[in-house]
From Swiss-Prot:
It comes from Danio rerio. This is Cysteine-rich DPF motif domain-containing protein 1. Belongs to the CDPF1 family. PANTHER family: CYSTEINE-RICH DPF MOTIF DOMAIN-CONTAINING PROTEIN 1, CYSTEINE-RICH PDF MOTIF DOMAIN-CONTAINING PROTEIN 1. Coiled coil: none annotated.
Length: 87
């Protein structure tokens, strides 16, 4: 994976499924984009499957309910398991 533009800031690691990947940006504004502002701060990388500079992939974010670092698609499972533990 070529991360020469905006080289890796660190390694994103999901606290639920343990998937990990280097990330090249964190925040609401992906680099090399003009009119894109994300609703939440998230970890992302330049899309390794696209030659276009503006394309990016979201890896995950901090869950707004439990504050765990989770990958895309696991937030509901994270919060459901936490609320089940409280019952």
């Amino acid at each position: 994976m070529d991360l020469t533009e905006g080289s890796a800031l660190g390694v994103f690691s999901c606290q639920l499924c343990e998937v990990s990947s280097p990330y090249s940006f964190y925040g609401q504004k992906p680099p090399n984009t003009r009119a894109i502002v994300l609703l939440e701060e998230c970890f992302g990388i330049k899309d390794p499957f696209s030659p276009e500079r503006e394309k990016f992939l979201i890896l995950g974010s901090k869950c707004s309910l439990c504050s765990k670092t989770v990958c895309v698609g696991t937030v509901r499972r994270s919060c459901d398991s936490q609320s089940e533990a409280k019952l």
